[in-house]
A protein has these predicted regions:
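Conserved AdoMet/S-adenosylmethionine-binding subsite of the radical SAM
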Residues: 1-104, 124
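Auxiliary Fe-S-binding modules of radical SAM enzymes
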Residues: 60-176
Length: 176
């Protein structure tokens, strides 16, 4: 799981830094394992574009597309109970500063904000990465796929089959 360094420092307390996460993934790759990255939970904040552009630059600097099975994007989503807990306990967090909308009993960003974030971060990747790495949206509204990643699926099973095929192809190439 990767995030912008500022979000790791301010929101993901007691976790590895971005650099440590990249080094750990590189060590796994060096030991013969393909890797995958979840850029998740993406958090809308001042300077988010620069923060996530840096994440992408570290991925591309330290890995080739052949090293990576998949990269997913996802945003912060809360249940009502978690959001109430944060507010009543006055947990210091930038998360409470963001505009959240209710959808399917949970709270998250609007589709417009998600579309902007996913499209922008995807655009930071080189064409080589876009062509050779399987990108997907993790548990996000299906209407976001086409405008953000340029493709869509007619069903969950179609997505799952495409993802499995991409994984197996990458793993086969990795061990060859």
């Amino acid at each position: 799981s990767l995030n912008a360094e500022e979000m790791i420092k301010k929101e993901e307390h007691l976790t590895a830094s971005l650099e440590e996460r990249i080094r750990a993934a590189a060590a796994a790759r060096d030991n013969g394992s393909p890797v995958g990255f979840h850029i998740h939970p993406m958090i809308w904040h001042k300077g988010w574009e620069e923060g996530y552009a840096h994440v992408v630059s570290l991925i591309e600097k330290n890995f080739s597309p052949s090293d990576i099975c998949m990269i997913s994007f996802g945003t912060l989503t809360f249940t009502k109970a978690v959001l109430q807990h944060l507010r009543t306990h006055r947990t210091p967090s930038r998360v409470l500063e963001i505009p959240l909308e209710e959808a399917a009993g949970k709270y998250s960003y609007s589709l417009d904000i998600k579309k902007e974030m996913f499209s922008k971060v995807y655009s930071f990747f080189s064409e080589e990465f876009k062509k050779e790495v399987f990108f997907y949206l993790c548990m996000e509204d299906p209407s976001l796929w086409k405008p953000c990643l340029g493709r869509e699926y007619s069903s969950d099973s179609e997505f799952e089959a495409d993802m499995k095929n991409a994984y197996f192809r990458k793993i086969r190439d990795f061990v060859s």
